Every structure is written in structure tokens, then in C-alpha cells.
Amino acid sequence: MELKRLSISWQFLIVLVLILQSLSALDFDPYRVLGVSRTASQADIKKAYKKLAREWHPDKNKDPGAEDKFIQISKAYEILSNEEKRTNYDHYGDAGENQGYQQQREYRFRHFHENFYFDESFFHFPFNSERRDSIDEKYLLHFSHYVNEVVPDSFKKPYLIKITSDWCFSCIHIEPIWKEVVQELEGLGVGIGVVHAGYERRLAHHLGAHSTPSILGIINGKISFFHNAVVHENLRQFVESLLPGNLVEKVTNKNYVRFLSGWQQENKPHALLFGQTPAAPLLYKLTAFAYKDYVSFGYVYVGLRGVEEMTRQYNVNIYAPTMLIFKEHINKPADAIQARGLKKQVIEDFITQNKYLLASRLTSQKLFHELCPVKRSHRQRKYCVVLLTAEANKLSKPFDAFLSFALANTQDTVRFVHVYSSRQQEFASTLLPDIEAFQGKSGVSILERRNTAGRVVFKTLEDPWTGSESDKFVLLGYLDQLRKDPAFLSSEAVLPDLTDELAPVFLLRWLYSVSDYLSDFWESLLHSNWREMMPLLSLIFSALFILFGTVIVQAFSDSNEERESHPPDKEEVPEKAGKTEPSFTKESSSKIPKKGFVEVTELTDVTYTSNLVRLRPGHMNVVLILSNSTKTSLLQKFALEVYTFTGSSSLHFSFLTLDKHREWLEYLLEFAQDAAPIPNQYDKHFMERDYTGYVLALNGHKKYFCLFKPLKTVDEETVGSCDLDSSRGKPPCGLGPKPLKGKLSKLSLWMERLLEGSLQRFYIPSWPELD
């Protein structure tokens, strides 16, 4: 009886769970969210998703519920666009990312938990990101927001970004620490962001985050991952490590004069913070990064020996943080603040009010736009008093007088600037009426910009500026008239753009780029996972495989060439009846170069295709014509003549036996204009024509050849007459080695002309067969 009751109770519980599961499934229906039917095609689903995504995107729709609606739309499309997930949802009602029976049971239990316990905070497991009350929701990032706002803003302040997702126990574990760090760092000026990997997969993949939780920093558009334990101090040190190391200079009594005098070269005010800690505070470093283009920052540790001289000179209270701003005068600060706890807003307001020198030098068009903005209305007029001076007069009396005048007449509507005439010649010549009258002297102009295209109205003092009291009186009178009548600026011109004087040269920019690339590579090599490193490793191993493969093939090729280069012990020399071949002495044989010096192959029907017909483009085969009787002597001379040209990999060397392939040679010579008198085949001396010593340079790809024809000597003509007598039955005359070697005496000069491309080329329609 008890077993029966227990069985009924279990059945009732299972039915109750299934009913609750069915009810919970109604909470989220991807078909209902996208407004499509269950039989909709992928094209219809995609079309509906694009329409709803454009309508409910948080960047375009300002409705308070737009973000939640957009998340539901993305989640619905993620399920229905994947056939496997769509089938799983249709069969089991699984609307999440988990698949399979085990995941399905977990999903059903989760929805049962959410419907049975109405307050999920009872168990303190905030798995559902749509319902949890977390600090992350305030900092959620979308891809467009990241690209259009976070990346450009990272050039002014670093960003700390966390990658999270649903069902992430580690994310829950680090949330208290994350909340504490965010509250501190955001107050110091660090940007905060959170990316939900489930809904912003594109952004998570773009950031290179393949696991959750992940924490990364972004500065100057560069991404750096956090790899230490998630504790407060480590995260603070990570943010500090993102900042460049040269933002704040350590200043002591030995180098403070040099530091403050840097305004002349850097064209910036210089800030000094006197603090009681050995290192500069993080707030000060973040401020230095935000205003690095406008102010140079230094830090003085008041506990260092010898600093008393500085604190006494500038009247600094060493028991409270003190910040001083120096401009053109290094003996007295232009402004100062002192407080027990310097806040971010106080420091930013202080720096903003002192971003520029009293009389800044116009070094770029960007600075010109900031100091002399375009007039927007009659109440927002901005005038610029420009001192056009030579660079050598920077510290002279006229410049000092201009500074003192600027200090005494500082107004919201008037800016004082100066320009080096030698560096901005076009700009100076436009404002000065008579450039020759102001040669080597200073001039002062008052101008007002009318538009961004460079149109200005101006008035230039007639006489050069010497800094005298009369000059100051005249300039003050001009400003008084301008205050009463804006039309006082009677001249009009279009100013050319200023040259950027402080821009780094190309070599420095290239070195900076290489340095950044190497640092990024080293960072990824140390900390990236295998998924990120696989393409790089594949490229490296492929390059190494090709390199070593080429070396091994070349080594085997060289060994084969050396093996084939050993000459045979004896050279077969055919003998003719009634003729005695000349014997080589040891002295003459020692002059024969080793076969390894010049590799000469015989051109036969076997090697004809590879050595000529299918020769690679740009390669040529230099062929020596010889007979069986002249083979040894001509090859010896040929090797000596072409030895200096064997360094070229595009030249190949061969020899052709005249006794075997006379017809092939006669066919080629027919295309050579006056290269040699071609005998008629009915001539009785047709087969007696001597072509030994001829050399042909054959270009197999372009189908042309160049011809070397040896010059006949007196000895050769005598030998020729002997050959005629031999044909009549008389004994032939002997042909010594000297006349044969003389045939190729001019070959080296011919080879030089061949490489120069100055030889005559004889083209043929196609290469004949070599029988």
C-alpha cells in the first residue's frame, strides 16, 4: 500500500513538473518574438530578424525596453537560424544554447526553479541575466558602441572590460571584487565595459575572448589581456601597466630646471605634483595620459633628500599634495592648487584652465584651430594676436616684451600666439604686407578666422615689432579700436595650412610601428591560447618546411652533380685508317679543366626536349658543334672559354656531334642571314663542309638562336686543302691541336655580348626534330 502511494506521488510530481515546464516555455517563443510561423523558411526568418533588429537596436531606439527587446530578438534568431537548435526547440521546447538530454533536463529544472521560487535571490544564484540586478547592466557594450566610442576614447583613457556569460560560476565568484574595483577605477577616470558573450558574440570574437570570464584592457586601440588572479591589487596594477612608462617624469633638485625649460622645445606648459609617496599616484598618471598632447607632467617625491630647495623656492607645503603649473617663466608658477585629497574633477579643471602657454607657438593646423577658433556669432568672437618672429629672436627683447604684454592684457576673447617665420614662410608672407621690410625683424598681426577653409580678416602693425613702449601703446590702441568696431580688421586673405613642426619623421614612425608590432607579437606568443596561435604556428612551420625542403633538395642535387662530374679514366678517341691521332703530353693534359668546373652534356634525341624545347623562360643552351675527331681538343678549349660564365644559372652548356646531326644543323643555319654559305645538296662537296667550332646559343622558349662562327686562319685553309686531297684518295693532312683551339679564341668576347643582349638573333618558326 505504501509503495502504491509513493508511486502515485512520484507520478503526480512528474506531471506537475511537465505542466510547469510547458507553462514556462510560453515565456519565450522565438517564433512569436520574430513574428514568423513555424514553417517559415530561413530567408523569411533572416528578413524578419533584420527588420526587427533595425527597429529595436539600442543605439537607434531610445525606448527603455529596447535593449531587452533587442536581446530577445537576437536570442530568437540564434535559435531559429541554426537548424539543429530549431529542431531541438520544436521537439523539446529548448530555447537555450544547451543541447542533448542532459542539458535538456537542466534547462527544464531551471525553468521549474524560476516559476516555483518567485524570488531567485533566495538561493543567490543570479544565472538569468535578464532578471538579475547587477552592476554589469550599466556598462554593457554593443559592437557599434565599442567601435564608434570606446576605441576612439581609448586614446584619452584606458578601458577595463569584462567578458561574461550565463551559467558562468567563475563570473559569479569574481563579481564582488569586480564591483569594488569598478567603483574605485571609474572614479579615477578609467573606462569600464562589460560584454555578454552570449548576446554579443561578434564583439567577443573581435576582442579575442574565447572563454568566460575574461578581463582585458584597451588603450590607444590596443587590446591587452589580464592573466593574473582576480584580486583588487592585481587589477589595479594591470590598469597601471597599460599606461606608457614615460608619461610622468621623476623630477628632483638636479633636473627640475631642465624639465621646466622644456616649454621652449615642446611648446607645452609643465605640471609638477609634490607628493608624499615614492611613485606618482594612479590618478595623476591617468590625467597625464588624458592631457599628454597639451601638458608635460612631472612628479616630485618630497621625502627625497635635496628637494627642500625646490619646496622652499616655490613655497610648497610638503604635508599636503600640491600641484603647480609653469609656463614661459620657470621661476614662478603660473597657477597652483593645494588640497588634502585631490579629486579627479578638480585636477581636470585645473589642467583645462592651463592647457596652453601665454603665447603658444603655432606648430600645427590643429593647434591653430584650437587657439583661434572660427567665429560662430557676434558674441563668440575670438581674436588672435600673432607675433611673426625669427627663430633666433625667441629669447630676445621683442619676444619678452610680447610675453609681458600678453600677461598684462589676457582676455577671454583674445589669444596671443607666435610663429617662426622661417618654418611657416607661406603663412608669414600672407600676413606681412611687405616681407622685405620685415626681413630679419618681427611683426605683429591681429586676425579673426571666418571659416574652416582658411579665410581670415586681419590687421598688421605697420612698423616692425621691437618691444618698445611705443609698440605696446600702438598694439593696445588697435585692440581698443577692435573692441569698439569689429570692422577694424580691414584686410582679408586665405591662409595656407600650417606645417606640423613636431610630427615625427618617417623613420621614427616606422620604428614605433615595428616596436608596437613586436610587442604585440610577444604578448600574443606568451599569453594567447592555441586557437589564436594556430594560424601563426601553421605559417611558421610551413615556411620552415619549405626552407628545409629546398636546402635538402639542393644538397642532394649538388651531391649528384659531384658524383657525375668525375671524368672517366680514358677518353674514347676514334681512330681512322691511315691517320695518327696526336698524343697528349702530361703538360697539355694538366691544362684540361676538371669536369666539375663546367658541366657540358651531349645534345641527343633523349635530352633534346628537356635541354631545348622545354627550356624554362629566360634560360639559354650554349651548344658547341664538333666532330668525333675534334671532340677532345674543342671541349677542352670550350670549357676554358666559358668557365667564367658558369656562375649564371640561366646558362646551360652542351655539345652536338656533327657526324650524327648534320641535317639538323643545316636546317637551322638556313635561317641565319649570311651566317655561312649553305652548299647545295647536289654539290659534290655537300657533306664535306666543316662546321666544327661553331657555337649556337639557343633560346628554347622564344625560338631564336645566336651564332658564333670561328674565323679561319692560314693553317686552317691549308688543312682544308688537305681534306680535298684526301677525298681524291691522297693521305689526309694532320690537324694539330693549335689550329683547333684557335677556332674558339674569340668565344669569351662573344659570350659577353650574348649576356649584354647585343648579338643578332635568328628566329625560327619551330624547333626541328633531332633524329
Curated annotation (Swiss-Prot):
Topology in membrane: Single-pass type IV membrane protein
Extracellular side, ranges: 554-771
Gene Ontology BP term (one): regulation of autophagosome size
Cytoplasmic side: 26-532
Subcellular localization, as worded in the UniProt entry: Endoplasmic reticulum membrane
GO annotation, cellular component aspect: endoplasmic reticulum membrane
Main location, first listed in the record: endoplasmic reticulum
Domain Thioredoxin: 116-244
Reported function: Plays an important role in regulating the size of autophagosomes during the formation process.
The protein's name: DnaJ homolog subfamily C member 16
Lineage: Eukaryota, Metazoa, Chordata, Craniata, Vertebrata
